[in-house]
């Protein structure tokens, strides 16, 4: 009986909640996740690696990476064939803002649309909302993205969390200032943030100002006050697209040369990544909020040497 209770506690609380190191054994009921990467102005390889490690460390996820062709080579483009339907969640980690000629084949775009519309889960990871400005259904799927002043609606909140839809041509195009330790507050309760404090401080976040798009069937989960303008903008949001669930967030910045930056060591980011991915797959969240979750007064970080899955961040094969 005692052994059974210990096993149950291990799987209930997981490595992050307990501060344990090493990748947990993947359970037979693990959620299958596909990360799609291949090009970005951010370090997409290291981002995919860290996201995979954070998820697989829990023992709840089985993660695969599919790398899109990052050239115009027709053979590699036509041979790339990610099977979205084999996974409960797709994590989008491509960004072509630095070179808009880099696109997925139209057949792959259409399959992602059908996948989400039919009930698949999509996680739009940080700069992935910068991507594919010419793909109109992608804009509908993600709700808000990095777009020009002339396109789409931007959302801004007041001190009572009332949302103003700023129409095309007003306000600014999407931008951000320097990264800062932002105080995030809950705007709408949701299974992802259930059990979080009303306010908490996240480490080194890049807050997107004036993210723009159709903003249809969209619910803002949390927001933060910009350190320069004093204006309040969404941090993360969910979108219902057909039968599918979509989660997008400003959190998750990892720049070229970063290995395990404080933004990824931040316990709130890791917890939210895990809980959002579980929700996208199941519509429910069972992963616990760790005791070391940050407060409004202080960030909370895993130690620099406490790498998800072990000390060598580059040893996990892709």
Task: Name each model-derived stretch.
Residues 29, 125-228, 289-318:
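An acidic, glycine-rich "communication" segment
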Residues 38-41, 126, 167-170, 176-181, ...:
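Active-site rim elements
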Residues 22-24, 28, 32-132:
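Helical hinge/lid and interdomain linker segments adjacent to catalytic or ligand-binding clefts
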Residues 119-123, 221, 247:
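Structural detector of well-ordered beta-strand residues that form the stable sheet scaffold
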Residues 4-15:
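Bacterial N-terminal signal peptides
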Residues 40-41, 96-97, 129-131, 198, ...:
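Short, solvent-exposed loop/turn segments at secondary-structure junctions
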Residues 16-21:
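Signal peptide processing junction and immediate N-terminal pro/mature segment
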Residues 22-31, 46, 57, 82, ...:
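Extracellular ligand-binding/catalytic regions of CAZymes and related secreted enzymes
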